């Protein structure tokens, strides 16, 4: 019987655009204040792209960063999966653009639309291709340019979102530091709690959809908050209990950076103290599929992430989509 192949994260790369949008900037744009934003979200600034920059541009930089860390060329990558809700265009897939621009000549791939859970979904997709033996080097990317679909006259959403990307390389593990388990869930009854109604086949782009501001994010904040707190905790408990762990065993909890109150409420349900949680939403805002790799990088830079650590990742996104992953850090 062949040995079971497990997948590990062998490299992590990230990128955010240099331009900052601070709470002070937003005070000049909408009726809000730094205190109001900080109390409700925990965000003090977010990075946003300059005009003409797209999701693939961020994803490319993150991918190159990961390759550089691993000492590999793009030609050695066999597949690329991109989690995003802000693709460069409806088609082709942003993964195709990334594949071409980084020079991954032999790679294939596709986009995954799971909103804030997009990186976790891309991570499992990539892991399964490694574990099946189909590929040895696969890249999972989470990237979004949320500023492209935000109405900067809507206080409820413009204070939350930012732009950013992260990429991880997955390879077969040679020790016990690998992706242990995943859990996923969708609940389509929450589709209208967080969505962009315009631009698809239901409401194709027209003068009317533009005038009605249908190409911007619409959110029921209270519904999202309640669902996210409950499901982020439930998904986390599932992967922990299924593998014989408790919250107290976790070295680092890496939640989707949606809102500081959501993060702390979910962590409280898991019995996790703040010194076991990485929170960088104050610096980057909610970058949708980019939040988890950016949070992993923040933890690494702070010296809070080392090889062998038990890491718990969890996210809830539009859809609703839910995802969690338990892993031993390997790089």
Over which residues does each language-model region extend?
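Flexible, glycine-rich active-site loops centered on histidine and acidic residues
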Residues: 131-165
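Active-site pocket-lining segment
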Residues: 228-233, 247, 251-270
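Buried hydrophobic positions in well-ordered alpha/beta secondary-structure cores of metabolic enzymes
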Residues: 9-11, 37, 66, 77-80, ...
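Phosphate/pyrophosphate-binding loops at sites that engage ATP/ADP/AMP, CoA/4′-phosphopantetheine
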Residues: 62-78, 234-251, 299-304
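Conserved catalytic cysteine-centered active-site region
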Residues: 38-40, 44-57, 84-138, 268-296
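Catalytic phosphate/nucleotide-handling subdomain of diverse soluble enzymes
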Residues: 294-314, 320-331
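Acidic, glycine-rich active-site loops and adjacent beta-strand->loop/helix elements
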Residues: 15, 83-89, 114-119, 142-147, ...
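Condensing-enzyme catalytic core mediating Claisen C-C bond formation in acyl metabolism
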Residues: 1-51, 154-226, 230, 234, ...
